[in-house]
Structure formats: C-alpha cells, structure tokens
C-alpha cells in the first residue's frame, strides 16, 4: 500500500529483494533500485557491500492524473532505515528533480554520512534543504570529473556526460567483486553548451572491461537523433 505524507506519496514494496542465489554471502556485493527502473522519475540506486552502502541519486516522481492531490512520489526508504547501522553515502549525478527531489525526505529518516554532488546540483540541493527545518546546514561535498571518493569497500570516480542540465556526471564504482559503470542520464551532443562529454575517458573505461553497465535508457526506443542543447 502506498503511504501518504504531506502530499508526498511513498511507495512501499512488500516483496522481498530479488537475488539470483538462494542466499546472500557476506562477501557479496548487492545491487538494487529503490526507484527509477521501468519508470521516468524516482531514481535511486544502491550498491551495498558488507557494512557500506553507496547510494546514487535520490529523486521524486511527478504523478499522473491517477494520483490527484499528490505533489510527488518518493522512493520507499524502509530498507535503508532497517540498515541504519551501516555506513551510507550519497552520490548525485546531476540536479534534476527526479534525481535530487527526495533528498530532504531521505535525510529525515536515514543517517547519511556524506553527500557528493557536482557544482550546479549542489547549489540546487542547498536551496532545497534550506526550506526544511534542521537540514539547512547539511554539508555537501562538491565533486567534478577529476574527483575520487574512497571508502573501505568502494572507490568512486566520475566522468563528464552531456544532459539537458549543466554539470552532469557518470559514475565508475569499483567494488571488491568488480567494476560498475553507472551512466546517470545522458545523451550524445556534438555541439553542447559548456563542457563536452569525456569521450576519451569513456573509451578508457571500456578498455578496462567493467563488469556491469547500469545505463540510462530514457527515449532509447525513439528513432533519430537527440536535439542539441545549443
């Protein structure tokens, strides 16, 4: 059943997390989405290894007419609440609402050790948090394509991508069990506004043969080319 909170709808999921094995080993790296799969919005992806969880994005979904009176839908954070003893850090790929809109609601329920965001997204998040009592002074660490985040089990690097908003990043996540490329939202634009995509870095990542690609697929079924931002 969905739960309503101040015109925000939180989706609950009674199904157990899906695993390809009958049981989970302590040394396994778990990957799961709390939103964003099969829908446009509510993007939130988790990469978990032992006592650490790397969260990528935390957005909202803008509902259709079937949810009259609901401003937006947020992911179900109950799994992260249950895992509150584990260390968690949040990485933001860009500043669209479907990737940052759920952050205030997450911070009110889940302990997050650090938030990393590119410059423009950082400014948008700070403005958003200033409207929520108790979250005004939340520290956000600015990142760019040259940044690196290292914890006990994760090493996270970044590369520039092109999107319809400035400062959009893709993410390279190295875990004890392999390497993951998380693209974030992207498109190929040969005449972009601002910084171009890191095609050379993308090619180098391909040479490294990552184990898993978590790719944006919005409008991938539409023929022809994307319109340039310029």
Report each predicted region and the residues it spans.
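N-terminal acidic, proline/glycine-rich, low-complexity intrinsically disordered segments
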Residues: 1-9
């Amino acid at each position: 059943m969905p739960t309503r909170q101040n015109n925000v709808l939180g989706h609950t999921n009674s199904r157990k997390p899906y695993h390809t094995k009958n049981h989970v080993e302590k040394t396994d790296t778990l990957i799961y989405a709390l939103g964003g799969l099969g829908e446009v919005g509510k993007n939130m992806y988790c990469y978990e290894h032992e006592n650490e969880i790397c969260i990528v994005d935390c957005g909202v979904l803008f509902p259709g007419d079937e949810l009259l009176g609901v401003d937006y839908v947020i992911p179900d954070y109950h799994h992260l609440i249950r895992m509150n003893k584990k260390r968690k850090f949040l990485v933001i790929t860009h500043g669209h609402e479907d990737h940052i809109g759920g952050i205030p609601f997450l911070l009110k329920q889940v302990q997050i050790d650090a938030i990393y965001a590119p410059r423009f997204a950082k400014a948008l998040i700070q403005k958003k948090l200033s409207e929520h009592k108790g979250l005004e002074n939340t520290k956000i660490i600015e990142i760019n394509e040259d940044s690196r985040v290292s914890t006990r089990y994760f090493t996270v690097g970044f590369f520039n991508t092109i999107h319809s908003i400035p400062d959009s990043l893709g993410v390279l996540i190295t875990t004890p069990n392999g390497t993951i490329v998380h693209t974030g939202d992207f498109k190929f634009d040969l005449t972009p506004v601002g910084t171009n995509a890191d095609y050379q870095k993308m090619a180098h990542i391909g040479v490294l043969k990552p184990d898993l690609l978590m790719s944006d697929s919005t409008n991938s079924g539409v023929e022809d080319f994307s319109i340039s931002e310029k």
